[in-house]
C-alpha cells in the first residue's frame, strides 16, 4: 500500500511525461521516447518538442513499463520496470550524457506529482492482505483515514468522517457506486460486484485537484481491472469457512450459532488472441454463503438476546396458526443460504501504434437475507425477514487515440443496468402482524415496506476528453454526460399492517390499528414512479511543469442538470403553501474550480497541496421521494379499535386458507382508498430554491524519504460544505414560545398540510483531519507500515436513511428544526493502523508469507437524550409530528457528546507456495484469520457500539447499558483455501 500524492483520475489509464535535457541542462528537442509494456510488448513512441518536453498518455494501468530515451549524438537513457497505477501521471525527467548510457531502475509506484491526499493499493497488496471477505474494503482500510464500519455487516466505507453515501466507486471508468442510494456499502449490489482477482490496482482519493473528478464529495474509490498479455496467465482459487471455524465465546459468554458451511471459488484467464495486437481477460467468482440470525429470546444463548420469553413467542406462533391459519416460521432460525455470482470479460485491441480499443462486460447477481425490524426492542419470526439483492449488468467501451506526439483523446461509453430485489421470505400473501408486549414488539408475516417494493435503474455515461502538450503545459478539455432513468415502486401497507396491544388481544382478534395504503385504483403498480435526469459537465485544465521541481495544476469544471420529469402537482398543497410541489433538478448548475501543486523541495522531500470545490454523491432516493410522496395517486388509511372477525374482506389471494384478517384487506379501507380519503403520509417536496450541494477541500501534505529507506507521509485536509442537503418539516411554524420543561423547548404549530422538504442547510458540513504514515522495507523480507489519523467531522443532519421521515427523525436534537453543527455519526476521532508483511524462502524457491493488519479506533459517538414520557410528553407534548422517543437532547448543541468505546483488532494471513505442474506455475495454500485478537483471548477484539440512531438516556449510561456488544465483528473467523497460478 502506498499513501500516494500522485494524480489518480476517474479513468483507466496512466501517463508518463517529463523533460529531456543534455548533461549541461539544455533542453533536447527531437529526442525519441519509447514506452514499452512488459506484458503486451506494445510500444508507444513520441518525440520531445522544442522545450525538450514529452507526454505519453493512455497507457494501460496496473502493469510495468520500460522507457528508453534516444537522441542523435547522445547516449541512451532507460528506465526498467516502472510500475504505473491507475490514473497515475508520472514525471520522468532525463539528462542524456555524452559519455555513457544512463540506466534508471524503477521498482515501485513513484510519487513525483501531487494533486491531493490519496492511497494506492497495487496487485501485491490485493493478493497478500488478509482479506477474509475478498472485498477491496478489506484492503483500503489499511489507510487510517478510511474506516470500514463492520458493526452491521455492510462494511460501509467512511472517508475522513463523511457519510458513506457521498463516496463514488469507479471500475474501468464506469461509475459502480450505489446509483439509487439504498445500500450503505456503497455498491449497487449486496457485495463487491466484480471478481476480486480481476482487479490490478485500487486508488482512493480524498481531495483530487483534477477537473476530471466528479460525482462525489467524500472520496473516490477507483479500481482498474487486469488485461491480457502475450503470455497466457491465469489462476484458480477455492476457500472454505464454517461454524466450526468461527468463535463461540465472547468475554466468557458462550455464544450459540447456527450450523453453516460457506464456499467460494473462482478462476481467471488472460492472454493474446493475436500477439501484440488483440488481448483477452476473464474472471469468474461464485460464493455460496450463509446469513446468520444473531438474535434470540432470553436464555437462548444468541449473540443478541431480545427481552422476550420463548414461551411468549411460542404462544404467539400457536395463535397465528390456530386462529389466523398462518404459519409464522421459526424463532430460532437456521442460517439463510445465499448465492453471489459474478464475472468480468475484457478485450483490448491495439488497432495500431496510435489507437487502442478496450471493451469490458461485467455481471453480478447476488442476494442476502436481512431482518426487517432488528432493533433491541423488536423480535421477528424468520418469515418476516426479507430477501434483498440486485442483478447488475455493465458494458464499457473505451477508445484511446494518439493523433500525434502532442494530442491524444479518450472517448468512453458505458451502460449500467441494475434490477433491485426486495422480497419477503414468507411470500406476499399475508399482512404484517405486530404484537406489542411490555418491552418488545413481535413481528410476523410480511414486512410493511416489502409489500410493494420494486426498483430498477439505468445509467448511461458518455465521456469525451482530449489532452494537448504545448512545451511544459498539458491542456486537458472534456465533456461528459451521465443520464439516469429510475423506476421506483415503494408504498407501504398495500397488504395491510395490523397492530395488537398484547397477546390476549391478538388471540381475540382485537386490533389496536389496521393500516392500509395503495394507489387509488387499488392496484399497487399505479403507485410507481418513473423519472430521470442528466448531468452534463464541461472542463478545462492546464498542467504546468514550471521547472524540474515545481508543477501546478489549474482547472475549471462546470456541471449542469437537465430533467423534464416533474412530480405530480397536489392542488391541496398549492392552495395551502402558495406554490407548487413540482420543483425538480432541472437547471441546477455549479462552477467547480481546482488548483493543485507539487514541489520537490529537495531530492528527499516533496510538498503538495491544493484547493478545490466538489459536488455529488447525494443519493437519488432522496430526490425520488419527491416523486413518490405527492399524495395524488395513492392514499394511506387506518382504522382503530377493530374487531377483525367482524370485518368484510376483499383482495384475498385465491390460495388463501380463508378470506379474513391478514389474508385480505378490510373492505371499508379499500373503499376509502378508492375514494381518495385517508390520513396520508407527509407530502415530500423539493425546495423551489434548492441548490446543488458542494464542498470545498483544502489539502497540504508532504513525503519525506530519509535514513535507510524510511518514507514518512503527512497530510492535512480541511473541508467546508455549502448548501448541504437536509430534510425539514415544511409545515411547522415557531410560535415564539418555549415549553417550561427543562431548558425550554421551542413550541411549534403545524399550520399547513404536513410535509417534509428537501432543502439546503444554512450551515454546511465541515471536517479537519491530520494523517501520518511511516513505511520501511527491510532487506530480510520484512515490510512495515504504521499509520495514524485524527479526524474532527461535523454535520447538521447525518442523513442516515432513504426516506424523508427516517432522515428527519433518526438523529438527536433539541429543536427539531435546528441547523446546528455537531459531531458527525461517522466521525472516528482517532485511528491507528499497522501492516506487517514478512516473506521468506524456507522451502527453496517457494515463498512463505505472513501478513498482519491491525487497527485501533476510537468508537462511534452517541448522544445523551431524554427517555420515555420525557421525550414525548414533557418536551413537546402529544403531537403527531414530534412523537420521538429517545431522540430529544437534554441540552442544546449536545448531539453525539459522548465518546464510543475503542475497538482494537488484528487480522492475519499465512500462505505457503508449493510447486506446480511446470517451473513457472505456483500453487499456494493459505489461512486467513479475521480478528486474531479474539482467537487468542475471547476478551479481546470485542466491539461495543450504541444502538442506532445513537441516542442513550442518562440512566443507561449510569447502568453501563449505553453500548451493546456486536457479535459478528467481535467473533474470530477462519478461512482456509488454496490457489494455483500460472
Where are the predicted features?
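Periplasm-facing N-terminal accessory domains of Gram-negative outer-membrane beta-barrel systems
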Residues: 8-103
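Periplasmic N-terminal accessory/gating domains of Gram-negative outer-membrane beta-barrel systems
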Residues: 49, 74-76, 80-95, 103-227, ...
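Short loop/turn motifs that connect adjacent beta-strands in outer-membrane beta-barrel proteins
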Residues: 211-214, 228-233, 274-277, 354, ...
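Transmembrane beta-barrel wall of Gram-negative outer-membrane proteins
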Residues: 233, 258-367, 387-409, 413, ...
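Solvent-exposed loop/turn elements at secondary-structure boundaries
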Residues: 566-592, 596-758, 885, 901
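C-terminal beta-signal and adjacent terminal beta-strands/loops
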Residues: 709, 802, 843-887, 900-907, ...
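Gram-negative outer-membrane beta-barrel transporters
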Residues: 709, 713-861
Amino acid at each position: 500500500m502506498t499513501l500516494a500524492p500522485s494524480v489518480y483520475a476517474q479513468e483507466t489509464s496512466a501517463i508518463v511525461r517529463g523533460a529531456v535535457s543534455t548533461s549541461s541542462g539544455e533542453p533536447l528537442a527531437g529526442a525519441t521516447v519509447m514506452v514499452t509494456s512488459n506484458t503486451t510488448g506494445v510500444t508507444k513512441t513520441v518525440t520531445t518538442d522544442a522545450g525538450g518536453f514529452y507526454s505519453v498518455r493512455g497507457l494501460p494501468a496496473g502493469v510495468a513499463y520500460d522507457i528508453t530515451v534516444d537522441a542523435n549524438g547522445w547516449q541512451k537513457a532507460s528506465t526498467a520496470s516502472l510500475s504505473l497505477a491507475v490514473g497515475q501521471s508520472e514525471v520522468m525527467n532525463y539528462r542524456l550524457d555524452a559519455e555513457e548510457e544512463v540506466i534508471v531502475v524503477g521498482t515501485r509506484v513513484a510519487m513525483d506529482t501531487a494533486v491531493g491526499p490519496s492511497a494506492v493499493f497495487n496487485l501485491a497488496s490485493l493478493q497478500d492482505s488478509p482479506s477474509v471477505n475478498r472485498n477491496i474494503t478489506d484492503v483500503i482500510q489499511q489507510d487510517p483515514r478510511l474506516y470500514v464500519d463492520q458493526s452491521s455487516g455492510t462494511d460501509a466505507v467512511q472517508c475522513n468522517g463523511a457519510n458513506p453515501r457521498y463516496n463514488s466507486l469507479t471500475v474501468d471508468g464506469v461509475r459502480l457506486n450505489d446509483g439509487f442510494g439504498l445500500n450503505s456499502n456503497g455498491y449497487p449490489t449486496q457485495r463487491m460486484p466484480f471478481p476480486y482477482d480481476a482487479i490490478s490496482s485500487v486508488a482512493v482519493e480524498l481531495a483530487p485537484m483534477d477537473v476530471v473528478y466528479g460525482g462525489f464529495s467524500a472520496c473516490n474509490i477507483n479500481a482498474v481491472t487486469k488485461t491480457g498479455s502475450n503470455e497466457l496467465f491465469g489462476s484458480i482459487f477455492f476457500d472454505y469457512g464454517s461454524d466450526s471455524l468461527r468463535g463461540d465465546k465472547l468475554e466468557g459468554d458462550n455464544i450459540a450459532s447456527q450450523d453453516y458451511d460457506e464456499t467460494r471459488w473462482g478462476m481467471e484467464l488472460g492472454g493474446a488472441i493475436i500477439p501484440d495486437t488483440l488481448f483477452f481477460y476473464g474472471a469468474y467468482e461464485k460464493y455460496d454463503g450463509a446469513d446468520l440470525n444473531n438474535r434470540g429470546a432470553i436464555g437462548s444463548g444468541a449473540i443478541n438476546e431480545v427481552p422476550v420469553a420463548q414461551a411468549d413467542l411460542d404462544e404467539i406462533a400457536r395463535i397465528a396458526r390456530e386462529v389466523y391459519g398462518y404459519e409464522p416460521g421459526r424463532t430460532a432460525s437456521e442460517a439463510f443460504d445465499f448465492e453471489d455470482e459474478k464475472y468480468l470479460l475484457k478485450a483490448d485491441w491495439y488497432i495500431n501504434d496510435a489507437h487502442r480499443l478496450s471493451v469490458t462486460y461485467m455481471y453480478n447477481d447476488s442476494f442476502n437475507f436481512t431482518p426487517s425490524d432488528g432493533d433491541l426492542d423488536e423480535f421477528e419470526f424468520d418469515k418476516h425477514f426479507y430477501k434483498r439483492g440486485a442483478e447488475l449488468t455493465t458494458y464499457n467501451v473505451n477508445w484511446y487515440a494518439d493523433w500525434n506526439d502532442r494530442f491524444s483523446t479518450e472517448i468512453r461509453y458505458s451502460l449500467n443496468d441494475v434490477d433491485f430485489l426486495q422480497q419477503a421470505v414468507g411470500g406476499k400473501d399475508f399482512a404484517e402482524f405486530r404484537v406489542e408486549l411490555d418491552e418488545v414488539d413481535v413481528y410476523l408475516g410480511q414486512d410493511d415496506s416489502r409489500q410493494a417494493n420494486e426498483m430498477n435503474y439505468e445509467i448511461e455515461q458518455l465521456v469525451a476528453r482530449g489532452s494537448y502538450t504545448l512545451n511544459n503545459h498539458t491542456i486537458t478539455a472534456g465533456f461528459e454526460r451521465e443520464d439516469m432513468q429510475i423506476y421506483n415502486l415503494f408504498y407501504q401497507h398495500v397488504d395491510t399492517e395490523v397492530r395488537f396491544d398484547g397477546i390476549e388481544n391478538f388471540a381475540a382478534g382485537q386490533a389496536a390499528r389496521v393500516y392500509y395504503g395503495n394507489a387509488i385504483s387499488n392496484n399497487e403498480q399505479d403507485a410507481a414512479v418513473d423519472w430521470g435526469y442528466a448531468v452534463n459537465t464541461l472542463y478545462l485544465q492546464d498542467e504546468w511543469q514550471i521547472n524540474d521541481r515545481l508543477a501546478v495544476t489549474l482547472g475549471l469544471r462546470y456541471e449542469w442538470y437537465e430533467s423534464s420529469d416533474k412530480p405530480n402537482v397536489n392542488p391541496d398543497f398549492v392552495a395551502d403553501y402558495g406554490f407548487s410541489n413540482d420543483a425538480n433538478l432541472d437547471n441546477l448548475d455549479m462552477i467547480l474550480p481546482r488548483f493543485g501543486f507539487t514541489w520537490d523541495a529537495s531530492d528527499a522531500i516533496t510538498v503538495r497541496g491544493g484547493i478545490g470545490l466538489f459536488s455529488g454523491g447525494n443519493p437519488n432516493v432522496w430526490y425520488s421521494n419527491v416523486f413518490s410522496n405527492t399524495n395524488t395517486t395513492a392514499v394511506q388509511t387506518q382504522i382503530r379499535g377493530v374487531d377483525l372477525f367482524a370485518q368484510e374482506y376483499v383482495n384475498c389471494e385465491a390460495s388463501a386458507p380463508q378470506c379474513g384478517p391478514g389474508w385480505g384487506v378490510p373492505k371499508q379501507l379499500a373503499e376509502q382508498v378508492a375514494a381518495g380519503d385517508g390520513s396520508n403520509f407527509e407530502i415530500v417536496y423539493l425546495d423551489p430554491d434548492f441548490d446543488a450541494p458542494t464542498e470545498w477541500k483544502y489539502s497540504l501534505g508532504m513525503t519525506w524519504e530519509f535514513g535507510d529507506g524510511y518514507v514518512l507521509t503527512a497530510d492535512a485536509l480541511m473541508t467546508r460544505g455549502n448548501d448541504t442537503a437536509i430534510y425539514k418539516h415544511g409545515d411547522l411554524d415557531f410560535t415564539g414560545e418555549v415549553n417550561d420543561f427543562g431548558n425550554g423547548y421551542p413550541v411549534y404549530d403545524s399550520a399547513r398540510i404536513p410535509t417534509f422538504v428537501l432543502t439546503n442547510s444554512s450551515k454546511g458540513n465541515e471536517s479537519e483531519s491530520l494523517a501520518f504514515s511511516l513505511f520501511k522495507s527491510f532487506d530480510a523480507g520484512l515490510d512495515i507500515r504504521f499509520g495514524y489519523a485524527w479526524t474532527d467531522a461535523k454535520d447538521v443532519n447525518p442523513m442516515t436513511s432513504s426516506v424523508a421521515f427516517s432522515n428527519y427523525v433518526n438523529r438527536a436534537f433539541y429543536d427539531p428544526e435546528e441547523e446546528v453543527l455537531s459531531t458527525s455519526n461517522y466521525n472516528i476521532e482517532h485511528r491507528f493502523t499497522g501492516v506487517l508483511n514478512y516473506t521468506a524462502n524456507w522451502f527453496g524457491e517457494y515463498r512463505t508469507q505472513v501478513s498482519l493488519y491491525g487497527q485501533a479506533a476510537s468508537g462511534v459517538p452517541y448522544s445523551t437524550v431524554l427517555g420515555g414520557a420525557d421525550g414525548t410528553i414533557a418536551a413537546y407534548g402529544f403531537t403527531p409530528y414530534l412523537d420521538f422517543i429517545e431522540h430529544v437532547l437534554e441540552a442544546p448543541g449536545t448531539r453525539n457528546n459522548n465518546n464510543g468505546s475503542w475497538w482494537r483488532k488484528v487480522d492475519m494471513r499465512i500462505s505457503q507456495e508449493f510447486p506446480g505442474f511446470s517451473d513457472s506455475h505456483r500453487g499456494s495454500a493459505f489461512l486467513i484469520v479475521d480478528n486474531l485478537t479474539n482467537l487468542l483471548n475471547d476478551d479481546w477484539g470485542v466491539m461495543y457500539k450504541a444502538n442506532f440512531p445513537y441516542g442513550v438516556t442518562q440512566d443507561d449510561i449510569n447502568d453501563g447499558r449505553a453500548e451493546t456488544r456486536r457479535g459478528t465483528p467481535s467473533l474470530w473467523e477462519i478461512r482456509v483455501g488454496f490457489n494455483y497460478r500460472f
